[in-house]
C-alpha cells in the first residue's frame, strides 16, 4: 500500500528547474502526479524532458514570473497542458538580492517583491479561481522561509517578501477553507542551493 498516492492528480510547480522546487516536482511525480515544471528559462523544457525519460508525466514551460501578463498566460497554458484541470499549485519560484540595507537599490527591492510575493499571490488567485470553476478541492503550497520569522543580514527584500508569503498563506487559508481549498506554507531553513 502506498501511503502517498497522487495518481491522476495534476500540479503546477514554479521554480522547478533546480533546488527545492525541482525536488518537490520530482516527489510529486514519484507519487503519480502529472506536473508542469515552470522555470524562468528554456531549461524548463530540458528538465521536463529529463523527467519524461524517467517515465514521469511531465511538461515544461518557460515563464518569466516577473512579467504579469506572461505569468497569467503561462498559468493558462499550464492548465491547458494538464487537460484543463488542476489539483495542486506549488509556488516554489523565488529570487534573491543581497546588499546592505542602507545601500539596497529600490530596483532590486521591486524585483524581489514582484517575483517572491506578487507573483505568488497572482498564481494563488488564478489557482483559486480554477479550483472554484472546477467545483473541486485544491491544494496550494507556498514556499516561505525561516526569514519569514526573523530578519537576516543584507536581505531586506527577501525577508519582507517571505514574511509576506507567510501572512498571505494565512489569509488565503482563512478565506478559502470553506471552499475546500487548502493553502499551506513550508518555511525551510538555509539550503545549499544555487540561489544561496
Where are these regions (language model features)?
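Alpha-helical segment proximal to the catalytic Tyr-Lys
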Residues: 129, 174-178
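Conserved glycine-rich Rossmann-like NAD(P)H-binding loop of the short-chain dehydrogenase/reductase
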Residues: 31-46
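Active-site loop immediately N-terminal to the catalytic Tyr-X3-Lys motif
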Residues: 102, 150-156, 178-179
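Substrate-binding pocket helix/loop in short-chain dehydrogenase/reductase
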Residues: 100-101, 105-113
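Conserved glycine-rich cofactor-binding loop
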Residues: 17-18
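Active-site helix of classical SDR
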Residues: 124, 161-164, 169
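Residue(s) in the substrate-gating loop at a strand-loop-helix junction
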Residues: 145
Amino acid at each position: 500500500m502506498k501511503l502517498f498516492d497522487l495518481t491522476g492528480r495534476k500540479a503546477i510547480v514554479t521554480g522547478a528547474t533546480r533546488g527545492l522546487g525541482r525536488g518537490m516536482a520530482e516527489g510529486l511525480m514519484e507519487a503519480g502526479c502529472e506536473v508542469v515544471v515552470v522555470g524562468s528559462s528554456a531549461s524548463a523544457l530540458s528538465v521536463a524532458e529529463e523527467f519524461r525519460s524517467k517515465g514521469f508525466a511531465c511538461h515544461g514551460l518557460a515563464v518569466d514570473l516577473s512579467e504579469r501578463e506572461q505569468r497569467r498566460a503561462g498559468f493558462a497554458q499550464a492548465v491547458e497542458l494538464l487537460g484543463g484541470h488542476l489539483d495542486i499549485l506549488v509556488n516554489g519560484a523565488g529570487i534573491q538580492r543581497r546588499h546592505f540595507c542602507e545601500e539596497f537599490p529600490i530596483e532590486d527591492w521591486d524585483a524581489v517583491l514582484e517575483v517572491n510575493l506578487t507573483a505568488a499571490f497572482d498564481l494563488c488567485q488564478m489557482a483559486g479561481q480554477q479550483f472554484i470553476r472546477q467545483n473541486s478541492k485544491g491544494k496550494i503550497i507556498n514556499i516561505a522561509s525561516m526569514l519569514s520569522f526573523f530578519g537576516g543580514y543584507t536581505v531586506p527584500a527577501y525577508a519582507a517578501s517571505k514574511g509576506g508569503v507567510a501572512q498571505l498563506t494565512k489569509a488565503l487559508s482563512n478565506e478559502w477553507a470553506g471552499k475546500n481549498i487548502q493553502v499551506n506554507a513550508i518555511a525551510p531553513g538555509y539550503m545549499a542551493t544555487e540561489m544561496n
